[in-house]
Amino acid sequence: MIIDRKITPYIILDTEPIRNALQKINANEEGLIICVNSSGLLLGVLTDGDFRRWIIESSQPDLEKPVEEIVNQNIISAKVVDSPRSIAAKLDQQVQFIPLTDNEGRCVAIARLRNSQILIDHHKIGNDSQYMITETCW
């Protein structure tokens, strides 16, 4: 499990348009975004699946609507002061990210399953990668 306090790529304000949420979720390459209000209070999470379901269920999807209108409030979260063991127990293949809040309910970090990929420059190398790293002695 990794606890990351650099959460800006995963955060969107509830008043921002859905279009911005889609752009952020695309940029962070993790398949989700955490919705907070102007005080940083956790309101919900939006995943790729939430967006797809919203598009399918909407007769006329409006990307300029505020994110708060489609946020999934049925989320799993934990307190940042909880034990690592109790936080890790909430993570599995279905739940790979958990927002962590302070005592006031503000999102201050995320917990996620350890990424099996190695990031080198802008390249992700993982178990399914067809890359090989070699050592050179120039």
Residue ranges, per PLM feature:
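Short beta-to-alpha loop/turn elements within the nucleotide-binding domains of ABC transporters
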Residues: 16, 46, 65, 82, ...
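The conserved cystathionine-beta-synthase
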Residues: 10-30, 36-37, 55, 76-95, ...
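Short beta->alpha transition motifs characteristic of CBS
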Residues: 27, 34, 41-56, 94, ...
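N-terminal nucleotide-binding beta1-loop-alpha1 segment
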Residues: 115, 127-138
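A short, flexible N-terminal coil/short beta segment enriched in small residues
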Residues: 39-40, 45, 135-138
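N-terminal positively charged helical leader segments and presequences
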Residues: 50-54, 58-69
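Solvent-exposed alpha-helices and their adjacent loops that cap or buttress functional pockets
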Residues: 2-4, 91, 124-130
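Bateman (tandem CBS) regulatory domains
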Residues: 1-10, 64-75, 131-133
